[in-house]
């Protein structure tokens, strides 16, 4: 049984990530890391808050939030810097 699972947040609806997070905790995972870049950052934050407040109230806490920047290859071969976030959720 894995003690940690990483969920990459992207273009899918927020509820997909909420369900994936809740299913991971129900399967026995102790820590879930939500990772997102760019426009998906707000979706990762919304996912963490929805899991903590609505789906598993009192059972999950936000343990850590890391703000990062990633270098990605943009159009025309130029390197761009994109904001990123990691939200760590743990069972209380």
Swiss-Prot record:
The lineage of its organism: Archaea, Thermoproteota, Thermoprotei, Thermoproteales, Thermoproteaceae. Keywords: Acetylation, Chromosome, Cytoplasm, DNA condensation, DNA-binding. One of its GO terms (cellular component) is cytoplasm. Acetylated. Acetylation at Lys-11 decreases DNA-binding affinity. One of its GO terms (molecular function) is RNA binding. It comes from the Archaea. Belongs to the histone-like Alba family. Pfam families: Alba. Binds double-stranded DNA tightly but without sequence specificity. Involved in DNA compaction. Its main location: cytoplasm. The modification N6-acetyllysine is found at residue 11. It is found in: Cytoplasm; Chromosome. This is DNA/RNA-binding protein Alba. It comes from Pyrobaculum aerophilum (strain ATCC 51768 / DSM 7523 / JCM 9630 / CIP 104966 / NBRC 100827 / IM2). InterPro entries: Alba-like_dom_sf, DNA/RNA-bd_Alba, DNA/RNA-bd_Alba-like. One of its GO terms (biological process) is chromosome condensation.
């Amino acid at each position: 049984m894995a003690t940690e699972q990483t969920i990459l947040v992207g273009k899918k609806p927020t509820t997909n990530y909420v369900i994936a997070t809740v299913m991971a905790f129900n399967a026995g995972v102790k820590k879930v890391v939500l990772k997102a870049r760019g426009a998906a950052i707000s979706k990762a934050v919304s996912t963490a808050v929805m899991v903590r407040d609505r789906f598993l109230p009192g059972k999950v806490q936000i343990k850590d939030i890391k703000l990062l920047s990633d270098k990605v290859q943009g159009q025309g071969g130029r390197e761009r810097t994109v904001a990123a976030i990691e939200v760590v959720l743990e069972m209380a």
